[in-house]
């Protein structure tokens, strides 16, 4: 519609559209899988954080699931994010925005994440990818 109206339209990045499955547990993802990133020629860093290590998840009784992140090892580009667990369809937005803005893993680690929250599992997974995780 914007194009028909004569507006400048930014090309859509089809690899940055979040996928959300509303089931129990919920599933969400954006970007490359590990295999797709390797197939595309990337050398990757992968981090994973289980909700069983999250204080908020434990308190809420939602300890099943995890957050997994995939980064380009050379430049730190956030290539993909995959989550399984309670409320993860709400949490994928951080990865979508970070990918859109070409945020690196180190920038995510420097951003203050609220604690205790389920969403801080994203930061913890990033920390794991960079061998800086402390809460696991």
Model feature map: region roles:
Residues 7-13:
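Glycine-rich active-site loop/strand segments that organize a redox cofactor
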Residues 3-6, 17, 23-136:
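Flexible, glycine-rich terminal cap/loop adjacent to redox cofactors
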């Amino acid at each position: 519609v914007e194009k028909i109206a004569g507006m400048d339209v930014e090309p859509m990045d089809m690899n940055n559209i979040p996928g959300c499955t509303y089931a129990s547990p919920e599933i969400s993802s954006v970007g490359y899988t590990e295999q797709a990133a390797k197939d595309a020629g990337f050398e990757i860093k992968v981090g994973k954080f289980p909700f069983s290590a999250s204080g908020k998840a434990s308190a809420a009784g939602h300890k099943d699931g995890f957050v997994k992140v995939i980064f380009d090892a050379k430049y730190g580009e956030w290539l993909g994010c995959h989550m399984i667990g309670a409320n993860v369809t709400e949490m994928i937005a951080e990865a979508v925005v970070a990918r859109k803005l070409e945020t690196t893993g180190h920038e995510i680690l420097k951003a203050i994440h609220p604690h205790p929250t389920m969403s801080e599992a994203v930061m913890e997974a990033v920390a794991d990818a960079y061998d800086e995780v402390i809460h696991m």
